[in-house]
Amino acid sequence: MSPVPCLSTCCCFRKIVEYSTMSWFRKSANDSLLETNHDRIPVAPPREVRAPSPRLPPSYQTSNEKMFRVRKAPSEEHTLANYAYVNRSDFDDKQIKHVRVNPGPAHHYIFSIRNDGSIKPGEIAFGVPHRKWAALSLDQEVRVTPFTFQQSEYVGSMILTADFNAKKNVTSEPLNADLMAREFSIQFGGQAFSKGMQMAFRFEDKEKNKTHTLSLVVKSIEGFDIGKAAAAASGASNTDSSATKPKQIEAGELLPNSVIVFDKEEGSMLNLIGKSKGKSAYRSIINPDWDFQQMGIGGLDTEFSHIFRRAFASRVFPPEFIEQLGMKHVRGILLFGPPGTGKTLMARQIGKMLNAREPKIVNGPQILDKYVGESESNVRKLFADAEEEWRRCGANSGLHIIIFDEIDAICKQRGSMAGSSSVHDTVVNQLLSKMDGVEQLNNILVIGMTNRRDMIDEALLRPGRLEVQMEVSLPDETGRLQILKIHTARMREYNKMDPNVDLEDISKRTKNFSGAELEGLVRAAQSSAMNRLVKAGGKAQADPDAIEKLAINSGDFDYALENDIKPAFGRSDESLNRFLSRGMIVWGPEVTKILDEGSLLAATVKNPENSGFRTVVLAGAAKTGKTSLAAQMAKSSDFPFVKVISPEDTVGFSESAKCMALKKAFEDAKRSKLSVLLIDNLERLIDYHPVGPRYSNLVIQALLVLLNAPPPAGHRLFVIATSSDRMFLRDMGLMDVFGDVIDIPKLTTAGQMMNVIQESNIYSDDQLPMIEQKLASICRGEGFHGVGIKHLLELIESARQCEADYRVPTLLNMMEGLALNLYR
């Protein structure tokens, strides 16, 4: 209950002569709305002679009925507070919040009560608006019964007609209905309201430093069932959807987040502005028919349901129920994940789920200011409205939502910036104290968004601050289909998309595409279709006759997928194709066996019954085709995410930079459901050199840690590495972290080498027998220990440059030199 407002105005009253209930009501139509011991303020007569009584089920009522004598409210302040007043010995307002007043056998009215020591036992005091509404005369005896609302009788939204209470107070200046609605919720939160109730409302316009006293009449009330609405919003399957829809009620209790709408009285000079004016703001506190696709959000149903359960479900219950539980609301949510997954779009819609105060959306860098202390002041300003409302009405305060985009810009780890007095540290300290400091606020919800969760100060991530941490990951196939339907809805509506376009097939082919990349794919397909209409010639101009026939077809999507849009968390096809530029030459059953082992390991990773994490190293001499075999394994695995870590990508990196690059690669791989990580040439990555020896211990330790860390639940990772020095890996302990080791052999027989030579297609069939005979002789020599396939291909390419008659002797001479260690 909010305290009775303190007003300084003291007015006189005129005694009302009463003969009967109806005769008093006719006389009082011209009496004052507010009365005190000195004067009155005239108001316009009410539009209705008698408001209908709320029809309430008997189960809503409690016993302990008493007879009371009607008295007038002690002061204007009491009237403005909108309570009926009784002595504590009759009803204690700490135990009884509302009463039902029966002035006659066919009528009853619901009031919220307050104790007042000036009211004698057996008396109940009402303000003039209440006495007019219930047609109560002074000294009239009424039956009063304690009353309790059921959970289905809470106010979701309420429409009130408003007018100036006196002609002398009429002004043409616009009144902000949004500020009025906020002030109304603060003053009257937790009170009972009935259809037709008359009341006085004093609104202080702080922007213009003016005070207005208005007469209000409750026009309609839309209620909802708190329990069923919360269950439906959180995804309960057994909830009747019709039971959660708002419905008209005769009486209900006002909640802090109830939607208040003001309509001006017919013929009134009142000028209202803002979203809470008229029917524009007429909406329920929770929309059970919330449609993510209409809001432009797809693939995030699970995330929304989880956030509602953790952060919003508790806020739809009455404050007194939360106090009985001793519960504190969640004050913060952190949305993190890869770029383009819909974090910002999700945050824009979160505030609309409860119809709370208009969210304050601020970019992280906007907080920073060049002047000393202004950055901290900007943080304090964001919480100023919530602090003021919390001081005034405590638990009855409405929800204030503050959204920080790119929160990592202002909430980095303290001490990570240069200088001990960095402005970033003081901003973090200010935000920490506002969210959960000495003066705790229970009416705020801070939503932060970032791509770099690891940069956020750990004190901000504890319970009580950014307590709910939700990863917004890449959409699955169902989510991708929802997103594609959203971005193609207008095209389908206006028949601008060929009906043969199969969005389900596109969603299957766009593995690991983010929401932003899917939007870009649709945009690229549209551009491809529009390009067909551009006339060829010196000037670029569209063909006006073909514009009406424009239709985006499946070919446009295929072209966009092939050439325009590549997912950031997709396959590194460019790197894989570079490693396989010579193709995959199966020179013997050894190659087939190696590829089969790789396929078996990939299938093991895919199997949901297994752990989903395997590591393998391809070890062999230099130029034996290890990288090509690893690339072929990665490509044939058909995993949507393939990342290549190559020494050439880290040239010039410091040891710390290499470790960060490795860590980021593993983190990116673990964000995808199915991932392959190819680490090429471990020795070069570690900076190993046998002279010394010299190597990077920091990189080795990073690899030991990362290769031992399995992916999160539901994610699967296959790590393939290559190495030319098996002894070094064993000495450094790296061999122990690889679950499987596959040896890559050299070509040691003439038949194996002939398979490669035949694939080159540079020798005629007549030359091949002589080459095979000479190679067999070389292989039998004591100095020949085999040749790597890459080395053999290099020799063949060198021979290709010769004239046709010299290709055979050139190749054989180089092979003989290889046997004599001339080409090692």
From Swiss-Prot:
Q: Does the keyword field hold Protein transport?
A: yes
Catalysis performed (reactions): ATP + H2O = ADP + phosphate + H(+)
Recorded GO MF terms: ATP binding; ATP hydrolysis activity; metal ion binding
Annotated gene:
nsf-1
What is the name of this protein?
A: Vesicle-fusing ATPase
Please give the family membership noted in the entry. Answer: Belongs to the AAA ATPase family.
Q: Which Pfam families match?
A: AAA, AAA_lid_3, CDC48_2, CDC48_N, NSF_ATPase_lid
Any keyword Aminoacyl-tRNA synthetase?
no
Where is the protein situated, by its record's location annotation?
Answer: Cytoplasm
Class of enzymatic activity (EC top level)? hydrolase
PROSITE patterns tied to this protein: AAA
Cofactor(s) named in the record: Mg(2+)
The EC code for this enzyme is: 3.6.4.6
GO biological process per UniProt: Golgi to plasma membrane protein transport; intra-Golgi vesicle-mediated transport; IRE1-mediated unfolded protein response; SNARE complex disassembly
The positions annotated for binding Mg(2+) are 627
GO cellular component terms? Golgi stack
- Keywords linked to the UniProt accession: ATP-binding, Cytoplasm, Hydrolase, Magnesium, Metal-binding, Nucleotide-binding, Protein transport, Repeat, Transport
